Amino acid sequence: MRLDKFLCETTDLTRSLAKKALHRGEVSVDGEVTKNPAVHVGEDSAVDWLGERLTPFGLRYLMMNKPLGVECTTRAGRYQTVLELIDLPKVERLHSVGRLDVDTTGLVLLTDDGQWSHRVTSPRTQRPKVYLATLAEPLQGDALTSAIATFAEGMLLDGEQKPTRPARLEALSPERFRITVTDGKYHQVRRMFAAIGNRIETLHRESIGPLVLDPDLEPGECRMLRGEEIAAF
């Protein structure tokens, strides 16, 4: 890798700022100051900028407890984005692995590993995603029995060509439910409850496949995934 590119990969320097840093003699490779941006940096090269050793950070994998009112998009818009909550270099390279809408909280995965992201979200895997929902109206008795059966059979939502895959509906109280789905249609859980004449007040994602949101993460906090968590997908 070229030295100027390596500087951009491991710092917040742009290509032009990296070349200026080189010109000022701020960078050394294997103990020798170099001003040549085309110098090759190998795996064993020791690169220092202003006396600080630079190391490539490689691929990154995070989980976040997404708060209310935050978007999973990486582009600045009306709402704050998940990337604005992350204090890492080159944060713009991260992307959300499956999104939550701005009104939904809970588990969001982020990475700069496109292949891993595809393994997590591929429809072929049918990975279960578990949500907690609070409803606007109580759901109980015969209406609950009917809803459980309807969710389990699959539903043809407005605007869709195929019905949803079988989903599990578990009542925690007349207004609070745990829902497990294995597909990822747009606003699917909200639309499923709307189809049976109810409305979701709050929606929170607990898990994706085997990965459960860390209970120690406060809304807006994130942490790196452990090796076994990454390998689970």
Over which residues does each language-model region extend?
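Basic, flexible Lys/Arg- and Gly-enriched helix-loop patches that mediate nucleic-acid binding at interfaces
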Residues: 1-233
